[in-house]
From Swiss-Prot:
This is Adenosine deaminase RL5. Cu cation 1 binds at residues 73, 75, 118, 135. PANTHER family: PURINE NUCLEOSIDE PHOSPHORYLASE LACC1, UNCHARACTERIZED PROTEIN YFIH. Its EC number is 3.5.4.4, 1.10.3.-, 2.4.2.1, 2.4.2.28. SUPFAM superfamilies: CNF1/YfiH-like putative cysteine hydrolases. It catalyses: adenosine + phosphate = alpha-D-ribose 1-phosphate + adenine; S-methyl-5'-thioadenosine + phosphate = 5-(methylsulfanyl)-alpha-D-ribose 1-phosphate + adenine; inosine + phosphate = alpha-D-ribose 1-phosphate + hypoxanthine; adenosine + H2O + H(+) = inosine + NH4(+). CDD domains: YfiH (cd16833). InterPro entries: Cu_polyphenol_OxRdtase, Cu_polyphenol_OxRdtase_sf, Cytotoxic_necrot_fac-like_cat. Optimum pH is 4.0-5.0. Activity is very high over a broad pH range from 4.0 to 9.0. Exhibits more than 70% activity at pH 3.5 and 9.5. Changing residue 118 to Q: Loss of 1.0 of Cu/mol of protein. No effect on secondary structure. Loss of catalytic activity. Changing residue 237 to Q: Loss of 1.0 of Cu/mol of protein. Loss of catalytic activity. Binds 4 Cu cations per subunit. Homodimer.
Amino acid sequence: MIELEKLDFAKSVEGVEAFSTTRGQVDGRNAYSGVNLCDYVGDDALRVLDARLTLAMQLGVDLDDLVMPRQTHSCRVAVIDERFRALDIDEQEAALEGVDALVTRLQGIVIGVNTADCVPIVLVDSQAGIVAVSHAGWRGTVGRIAKAVVEEMCRQGATVDRIQAAMGPSICQDCFEVGDEVVEAFKKAHFNLNDIVVRNPATGKAHIDLRAANRAVLVAAGVPAANIVESQHCSRCEHTSFFSARRLGINSGRTFTGIYRK
């Protein structure tokens, strides 16, 4: 049994579940120790498959109902629909290559992303029956991937002021120290730096609030601020519960954040 961190929306949503996996029992000497569903970060393939099978069984879905992209810090969004489901496995994998967000209205399909400090965002318009998930690292945030997801949801029939968004466990501002080139990227992308950047007085280093930056992107895209909630779990501070590349290194497991219509 995998312990799941339930992600709640600001308003009650019927028939939709959203969650992030936790690592479970951890061997501190092994950066992959615990529950990892990501198959392209160097973990043992059989361990990853076992974790996926366990989660699918726990959620009451088939293994091929777990859909996750091969993320590359892009701003590409894929729609998981009947046409996608009709593709063979190789065609599906090709369609998910270089994708960092998914949208679907299909019931019983668990869409999700894998993160280790980046911000996972789940979104829903329950009236339209549309759910989505995105992976927003600093590059995806600068590229406003959350806006791209909202726009795709609306193309599929969602109404922007009905959309609710919840951010899963991710790195907190205190832990997310960045170089000046990252600050400059946010500046060039016209983010309000006063809202998202602070300097550590002792080191002079910049720290960015990725959650606040993504909240700003969502609000600018038309999602009501009252409809956005953020997990307060920091992946780096709580690296024994959630994977953290900053703490464990890039060769480590990933936290899976998913959403589905029951």
